[in-house]
């Protein structure tokens, strides 16, 4: 009963044990449980940027699903620094976590391969690595970009500029690459990509975009929620109105985005579900024999159409 194996128990027996546990106030001893099974029933979770609204949503999905399986989580934030990521992985191994769910910074592919060779289980959340080594759960970004481009074309836009932070991780790289690849399927000319690097130069980037597209109906497509925040701040500083002067849309559907103007058109990512699926995948790795190649699961996104476009 305490291990959740009910298949050989009658409903009457289950209820009798449950009543006894409640009456006695029994609480399982996690240490004794781990010593017997040689498992800690703890998963390590490393996120790349704890300040991003993406991370708490991901962690909520992971935590809720871990509760269901009787696991606890140990959380660390790598600050998008590969060295910190390596240090936290080693620290979690020293603390005997059963597996690690990793929202990776990138730049640690060989280290991860060597660590996995020692037996540590990894599941990648949202971001991938170059080597096909680990099960990965992320959003179906290509389909989402296709949906957004079709919508913008249908709404009468003639040109779209893609705004992104520097391409330092797999998600930014893949989204930008897809945008470039499919742009000509919907619009004339070459794909326009604008990089938001130093905050003090955002106004220059925005002005360049506005000058380049002065003669057509145009829209900005933001690569993630952090970029969208910087774009909105810059447009406010330059007194640029959306959708009057340019349309605005992008990845991530954070709560504040519905409060700006008449709301921003967004791609609502299944971040909570990504967290849950990472845990389910980890449970499979820990409790069932591995067969076949690592698997990648893409979860569908939802377009939220609002007044910014």
Which residue stretches match the model-derived regions?
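Short, solvent-exposed amphipathic alpha-helices that sit
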Residues: 16, 54-68, 144-148, 170-189, ...
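Flexible loop/hinge segments that line or gate small-molecule binding clefts
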Residues: 80, 102-150, 168, 226, ...
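Periplasmic-binding protein-like
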Residues: 89, 96-104, 161-164, 214-224, ...
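Flexible loop/turn connectors
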Residues: 207-309
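N-terminal helix-turn-helix DNA-binding module of bacterial transcription factors
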Residues: 1-39
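An alpha-beta-alpha
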Residues: 146-186, 190, 291-308
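Hydrophobic alpha-helical segments within soluble ligand-binding/sensing domains
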Residues: 135-162, 177-181, 200-210, 228, ...
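Short beta-strand elements in bilobed, periplasmic/extracellular small-molecule ligand-binding domains
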Residues: 66-77, 159-162, 180-201
């Amino acid at each position: 009963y305490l291990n959740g194996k009910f298949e050989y128990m009658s409903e009457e027996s289950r209820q009798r044990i449950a009543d006894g546990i409640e009456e006695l106030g029994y609480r399982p001893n996690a240490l004794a449980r781990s010593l017997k099974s040689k498992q800690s029933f703890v998963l390590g979770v490393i996120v790349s940027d704890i300040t991003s609204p993406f991370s708490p949503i991901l962690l909520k999905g992971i935590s809720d699903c871990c509760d269901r399986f009787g696991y606890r989580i140990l959380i660390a934030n790598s600050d998008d620094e590969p060295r910190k990521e390596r240090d936290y992985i080693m620290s979690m191994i020293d603390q005997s976590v059963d597996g690690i769910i990793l929202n990776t910074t990138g730049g640690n592919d060989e280290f991860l391969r060597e660590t996995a060779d020692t037996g540590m289980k990894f599941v990648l959340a949202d971001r991938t690595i170059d080597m096909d080594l680990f099960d990965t759960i992320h959003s179906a970004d290509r389909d989402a970009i296709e949906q957004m481009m079709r919508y913008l074309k249908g709404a009468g836009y003639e040109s779209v500029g893609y705004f992104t932070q520097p391409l330092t991780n797999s998600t930014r790289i893949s989204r930008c690459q897809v945008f470039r690849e499919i742009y000509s399927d919907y619009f004339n000319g070459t794909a326009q990509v604008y990089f938001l690097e130093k905050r003090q130069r955002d106004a220059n980037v925005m002005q360049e975009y506005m000058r380049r597209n002065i003669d057509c109906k145009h829209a900005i497509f933001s690569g993630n929620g952090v970029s969208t925040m910087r774009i909105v701040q810059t447009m406010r500083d330059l007194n640029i109105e959306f959708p009057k002067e340019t349309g605005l849309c992008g990845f991530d559907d954070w709560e504040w985005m519905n409060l700006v103007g008449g709301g921003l058109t967004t791609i609502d990512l299944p971040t909570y579900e990504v967290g849950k699926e990472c845990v389910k995948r980890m449970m499979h790795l820990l409790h069932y024999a591995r067969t076949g190649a690592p698997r990648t699961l893409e979860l569908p996104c939802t377009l939220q159409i609002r007044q910014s476009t």
